[in-house]
Every structure is written in C-alpha cells, then in structure tokens.
Amino acid sequence: MNQSLLAPYGNAIERVNAALTALRQGKGVLVVDDEDRENEGDLIYSAETLTNEQMALLIRECSGIVCLCLTDERIEQLQLPPMVSDNNSQYGTAFTVSIEAKQGVTTGVSAADRVTTIKTAIADNAKPDDLARPGHVYPLRARPGGVLERRGHTEGTVDLMKLAGLKPYGVLCEVTLVDGTMARLPEIIEFGQQHDMPVLTIEDIVAYRTTQ
C-alpha cells in the first residue's frame, strides 16, 4: 500500500481512530484492502445508523451491489444459507442468499427499501420469516476472527463496528469511477476529500487490533 498517499491521514492507529470517530457520528468511511489482493476501496457505513441519503450515495457512486456484513450469530439467527454450497470465488467472499424485508417495501430496489431491509435484518428480535429470499441486499458472513483471520472488507467492516461500540453489522459497496472501472487508492482519497470521509486500510485495522 502506498503509505505516502495516506500520510496526511496520520499513522495506522490514528487512521483507525479517525474512522471509529466518524462511524460513531453516523458518517461513512473508506477502506482499501491490500494491493496484492482486490486492491479496491469500499464505502462503509454502520448498518445501525444508515440513512436513506447514505444508501442513495452507495447506489449512485458505487457498484450497486450493496452488501450487509453480518456476524456468524446473526446469520444463524436469520437462518441464511450460503449463496452456493461450494464457494470457489477467488477470495472466498461468503455471500448468503440475498434478502428483502417482507414488510414496508415495494419492489425492494429503492434506497429507502434497501434501508428497510437492512434495518429489518439487524433488529434485535429479527426472525427468519421477517425476510423474503431472494432480494436486493446481499448479506456477507464475516469470519469470527475478523481481519486477523481474513484480510477482507467484510471482516474489516465488522471489526470497525465492534471497535466503535456499535452493533457489529455494517454496509459496504465498492467505489467505482464514472466509466465503471474500480476506484484505486488515489481515487479513493479524492472521493474521501470530496465527501469528508476518513480513509484507512485493512492493514491499518490489523495493526490496530494487534497493538491495542
């Protein structure tokens, strides 16, 4: 990772602390993974504080595949099976079946409908029957060990929510450029400056968890 581009945001610990502060304030953060992995940047929000306006930004500025990062416990509570029985995707991203709230939505596609689905899925008393399958929100199952077990955006998202003292559920989507290609670190930093969002890396979260 090009640390010189990240230098204005401080060191790894300072970058994580800035992200935790932003999340506690209901703001978004931008997380970039390793250059030798996906080398992509994701816009991440707390599922707990997510607003319709934030969802609209995710849909407008990102890939459109809005994912809900969940813990093992929540996946089991909702009885969400894996999307496929044999996951042979390059990075083992643990998609479950997609979901839709049964109540309070129309087609499920709008920003408001997707937020309703997410809030339904993370409610304390959520039940499997609260959700229809398939739908327009894509749950991801985070590994229990977080980024120390798998250096992915899914685990980084759940780790950040836990460290921020929020419900351990987050929403992510990959940032894309106008031409549809994926945004890399320089573009992610520019996006963060435009939207007043902190930028950090999966490597930063690993460093934070191993030193704090």
Curated annotation (Swiss-Prot):
Keywords of this protein's UniProt record, alphabetized?
Lyase, Magnesium, Manganese, Metal-binding, Riboflavin biosynthesis
- What residues does Mg(2+) 2 bind to? 38, 153
Similarity comment: family membership:
Belongs to the DHBP synthase family.
Q: What is this protein called?
A: 3,4-dihydroxy-2-butanone 4-phosphate synthase
Query: Which PANTHER family does the record match to this protein?
Result: 3,4-DIHYDROXY-2-BUTANONE 4-PHOSPHATE SYNTHASE (PTHR21327:SF38), GTP CYCLOHYDROLASE II-RELATED (PTHR21327)
Q: Which GO terms describe its biological process?
A: riboflavin biosynthetic process
Q: Binding positions for D-ribulose 5-phosphate?
A: 37-38, 42, 150-154, 174
Which GO CC terms are listed, alphabetically?
A: cytosol
Per the entry, the cofactor note is: Binds 2 divalent metal cations per subunit. Magnesium or manganese.
Entry EC number(s) = 4.1.99.12
Say what the protein does. Answer: Catalyzes the conversion of D-ribulose 5-phosphate to formate and 3,4-dihydroxy-2-butanone 4-phosphate.
Gene encoding this chain? ribB
